[in-house]
Amino acid sequence: MKKTAFTLLLFIALTLTTSPLVNGSEKSEEINEKDLRKKSELQGTALGNLKQIYYYNEKAKTENKESHDQFLQHTILFKGFFTDHSWYNDLLVDFDSKDIVDKYKGKKVDLYGAYYGYQCAGGTPNKTACMYGGVTLHDNNRLTEEKKVPINLWLDGKQNTVPLETVKTNKKNVTVQELDLQARRYLQEKYNLYNSDVFDGKVQRGLIVFHTSTEPSVNYDLFGAQGQYSNTLLRIYRDNKTINSENMHIDIYLYTS
């Protein structure tokens, strides 16, 4: 009897350390799998830069920043953002509208995003890095405890387990970018997402979907990037899309053909 009880408790403990199946489905309603872009349609430069962005490059992460400075009306310039970077001092954040800027300019904000220097236009030349979105309000946006986001992942229709620690946030309202950066890093590490076929990059198409209980879902074609360099590859985050982290989960669909 004691052995049976111990076995049951061990099973429960192991289950809680991985992402459960949460309101998932084997196919996304947002984008048909046949419409997903194939990895072979990306140029080699773009594929290499996607790998660099999501796996190797450090991210801009900070809390409780404030700035009234701008370069253009759809930007906010954070002077002295980098304190120990080899090249950059300032961070120029670009949004797709002035309305978004007005929500954050002069307010206490938190930042989490992928930044780049090559082809960054604005600020002090060679001393300013650029980033699209990645901004949330600081005040009254902190969870009482860190949120670990459950992930459902299917590879060619077969569900694979994803550790529950893979994607997490301490924010009530979080940018999709923050969650997406963490998820794609895992996909690169586990599945060589942005490797070429020669270097064991077996995944040929993919879709990531961010679901919440109260808002429309947000989805990205994992190989749907435009252009070759960070200034265009990262433009999907320019809308600074945020979602409520409560009762949310992520669905990922990967295909090897």
Swiss-Prot record:
Zn(2+) binds at residues 211, 249, 251. This toxin seems to be coded by a bacteriophage. Coiled coil: none annotated. GO terms for molecular function: metal ion binding; MHC class II protein binding; toxin activity. Binds 1 zinc ion per subunit. The zinc ion is necessary for the toxin interaction with MHC class II. Its cofactor is Zn(2+). It comes from Staphylococcus aureus. Staphylococcal enterotoxin that activates the host immune system by binding as unprocessed molecules to major histocompatibility (MHC) complex class II and T-cell receptor (TCR) molecules. In turn, waves of cellular activation, cytokine production, and migration into the lung tissue and airways occur via alphabeta T-cells. Also causes the intoxication staphylococcal food poisoning syndrome. The illness is characterized by high fever, hypotension, diarrhea, shock, and in some cases death. InterPro entries: Enterotoxin, Staph/Strept_toxin_CS, Staph_tox_OB, SuperAg_toxin_C, Superantigen_bac, Toxin_b-grasp_Staph/Strep, Toxin_bac. One of its GO terms (cellular component) is extracellular region. Keywords: Disulfide bond, Enterotoxin, Metal-binding, Secreted, Signal, Superantigen, Toxin, Zinc. Belongs to the staphylococcal/streptococcal toxin family. It is found in: Secreted. Monomer. Interacts with MHC class II molecules alpha/HLA-DRB1 and beta/HLA-DRA chains. The interaction with MHC-II molecules occurs at both zinc-dependent and zinc-independent sites. Interacts with T-cell receptor beta variable 7-9/TRBV7-9. Its main location: secreted. Residues 1-24 form the signal peptide. It holds the Pfam family Stap_Strp_toxin. Disulfide bonds join 120-130. This is Enterotoxin type A.
